[in-house]
Amino acid sequence: MLKSLFCIAIAGLLVSTSAAAPASAAPAPIDWAACGEIGGECATIKVPVDYADPSGPTLDLAIGRLKASEPDKRIGVLIVHPGGPGGSGISPFILNGAIAPDSAMRKYFDLVSLDPRGVGRSTPVRCSADVVNESPLTFPANEAEYQAWLAYNAKLSEDCREHTGATIDHVHTTNAARDIDSIRAVLGERQISFFALSYGTQVGQQYAELFPGRLRAMAIDSNMDHSITSVFRYLQTTTEDLEGSFKAFVRWCDSTRACALNGEDVTGVWDGLHDRAAAGRLDDPATGEPITAEQLRLTLFDAMYDPAGSWFDLASHLKTLADGEATARTTAKTGKTSKTGTTGPRKRQETVGYAYPSIWCSDWKWEVSGFEQLDQYRKRLERLYPHTKLSPFWSDVLVCLNWQGKVSNPQHRLDITGNPPTLLPKARYDVGTPAAWNYGAARQIPRTTVLEYDGVGHGQYRNSTCARTHIETYLTSLVLPPRGTRCAAEYPDRPSATAKAERGPLSPTGRPLH
C-alpha cells in the first residue's frame, strides 16, 4: 500500500551552532553518510541564516537522498518537499520510503528531501514544553477568551525566541525557497525537478518566483494560496470544503452497504452528536470523558484527509458514539490534559520542537479588529455550513494574533515568468488545501495544467491512482495530461484488513497542519 506523502516528524532533534561562511565560496563537498534501512544517505549543509547577509551566520540544513534505483536511466534530481509548516521530509521520504520503490520517482531520479529550516534536524525552533502546553484550545467564545489568546501568543513567541535565538526571524517561506536553490547548487545540478504537497507547494510557488529557469519540472499537489488576505475568506474556504467533504461522506455511506451507518440518516446522526457535544452531553464511551464539539469536528476533519483509510472507521465511531458503546477509534484530542478530555505529552520535556507558528506567522498577516469581528465570522459560517460549522483551521488565524515577530513574507500574488509547464493536481473537496486555494494558485502560475480529482482527500498522489500516473508521467517525460482531464473518485467499498488510516498532521498543541 502506498504510504502517506505527508507523514510528519515534529519532534525537535539536535540544535546546531551558527558559523560564518564567505558568500563567494564554492559549495563544500557533501559528506554523505548512510541513514535508515532502505539505502538512504543523509548529510548537513550550511546555508545563510539571512540570505540578505550571505557572509554572515549560517545554520545547519539537514538533507537526505535515495539514489535512482535505475542509474543508467537517471533523469536528474527530484526534490520532494514536505507539508506543515513543521513537517520533516527526511523521516517520511528518505528513512521510511513514503514514495514506493517501484515508482518512477524512485527509479529515475535521485530523490532528495530535507527537514526545512527550523524543523527537526535543521536548527529547529524550540520552545518551552510547559508554555506550549498552556495553549488555548478552542475558538474564543467571549472577549476574555480572545484576550487569553492574545496574551498567550505574545508569551509563546517570546519564549520560542529565547530558546531559539535570531534564527527564528528567518524561517519564513522565502528563505525556505532559497534553501532549495542552495541544495541544487551544492548538488551541482543546473536544474531540478520539484514535487511537493500541501504547505510544500508554497515553497515551490515561491521558488518559481525566484528561480524559474532552474526548474526542469514542477508538480505541486494540493496547493496553498498565499494571496488570501481576508480572514473571512480564509475561514470560509476551509469550512466550505469540510462541509462538502462531509456531504460526500454521507453519500458514500448511503451507497456502501459495508458502512456502519448504511440505511440510517447519517446527517441526522452527525447533527445529533454535534448538538449533544455542544451542549456538554456527549461522553466518550471508552473513557467516560466529555467530547466537545470542537473535538468531534476535528475527528471528522481528520478522516477527510484519507477516505480509503478512514471512512469505515469514522462511520463505526459515529455509530458507537450514537449508541453509547466503546469503539477502537478515539475522538480527536487537542492538547493538554483537562476536564475537556484532552491529552498532554507522554513524557515531560524542557523544550520541544515547535516550528509551525514561527514559520506561519512570518508568512501571514491577519487583520482582525477584535473578538466581535471573529464572532460575527463564526456565526456567518455556521449559517452557511450548518453541519460542520467551522473548520479547525481557524487556528491558522488565531495563532498569529499578537505574535511578537515580523511578517517577513506577507501574502502576495505570485509574480512568475519563465517557469516550465506546471502540473497542479487538486481534489473536488480537500479540507487541508481547499479547491478554491488550488484554483487561486493556478490562476497565478503561468503555463499551469490543473488535474481534477473528483473525490475527497488531501494529497492526490496518494488518493488517486489516476492522478499518481499523470504526476509520474509528467515528471519523467514532461508530458502533461490534456487540459480538462478528470480523475474519478476512488472510495473503498469494503474495509481493508491492511489499510492503515493516515491522519492529518498535528502540531504539539493538537492543532492541524497543512
Where are these regions (language model features)?
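Structural motif
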Residues: 282-299, 305-309, 343-354
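Flexible "cap/lid" loop of the alpha/beta hydrolase fold
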Residues: 166, 224-243, 315-319, 326-335, ...
